[in-house]
Regions:
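Short tryptophan-centered beta-strand motifs in secreted/extracellular beta-sheet-rich domains
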Residues: 24, 82-84, 147-163
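Extracellular carbohydrate-recognition regions
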Residues: 2-37
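Secretory/extracellular carbohydrate-interaction modules
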Residues: 55-124
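Short, aromatic/His-centered strand-loop micro-motif at the edge of beta-sheets
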Residues: 129-151
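Short strand-turn-strand beta-turns centered on an Asx-Gly dipeptide
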Residues: 164-169
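Extracellular glycan-recognition surfaces and repeat-rich motifs
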Residues: 27-55
Length: 208
């Protein structure tokens, strides 16, 4: 007999913890789940195969496109995982944050993010953690922040945070870890006359 999905995901005798899976499919974003925030930005479902959600800015230097759980912080700072599959249309002229955070605007509050900003932090993905006393940046070193699809996995424990790209590169931070509960978030902004885009087609978050 095939086990239920519950039995496959959890050891026998245990009680499941919070988990959600988002495939970013259909004709519009599920606004019963996601809160949208835009400053000259948009979020629409991509009209392309496996395109997921297309987040876009304009050429305005203050353009922002951002989604989160409307400040419903359901995930633990000492035991949680976020997995996201996404690609950037451009890695210059702005920045992107994808991760778990306590704030309600892009990169705000405490949290842990997979971060891209080619002009400031180099042409690689960065792991950025923020705690009560400040932030810590760790470069992945060998994973270029290009315009291909990548799988990003962030994990938080009581003693460390880690970022894994495509299952084979992991960087770890043990300083400035978040000390409060967190919500999933995705955001891009623009700092020059470049129309930035980000496609995201899968996200999963769960408490461990």
């Amino acid at each position: 007999m095939t086990d239920s999905i519950y039995d496959q995901l959890n050891a026998y005798g245990t009680v499941a913890k919070q988990r959600f899976v988002e495939n970013f499919s259909g004709w519009q974003l599920d606004t019963d789940r996601w809160d949208q925030s835009n400053t000259n930005g948009t979020q629409v479902m991509a009209d392309s195969i496996d395109g997921g959600l297309l987040m876009s800015t304009t050429s305005s230097g203050s353009s922002i496109s951002y989604i989160d759980f409307a400040d419903k912080k359901q995930f633990s700072n000492t035991g949680s995982v976020m997995i996201a599959v996404m690609k950037h249309g451009s890695t210059t002229g702005g920045e992107s944050y994808t991760g778990l955070q306590s704030g309600t605007t892009q990169g705000n509050g405490q949290g842990a993010w997979s971060y891209v900003n080619d002009s400031w932090k180099g042409a690689v993905f960065n792991f950025y953690t923020v705690g009560a006393s400040g932030g810590t940046w760790v470069q992945t070193g060998c994973v270029t922040s290009d315009t291909n699809w990548h799988t990003h996995k962030i994990e938080l424990t009581s003693s460390a945070g880690s970022l894994q790209i495509d299952g084979n590169t992991t960087v770890t931070s043990t300083t400035n870890l978040p000390a409060v509960s967190l919500q999933p978030s995705v955001g891009i902004n623009n700092t020059s006359a470049v129309n930035r885009t980000l496609n995201i087609r899968y996200m999963e978050c769960y408490n461990t």
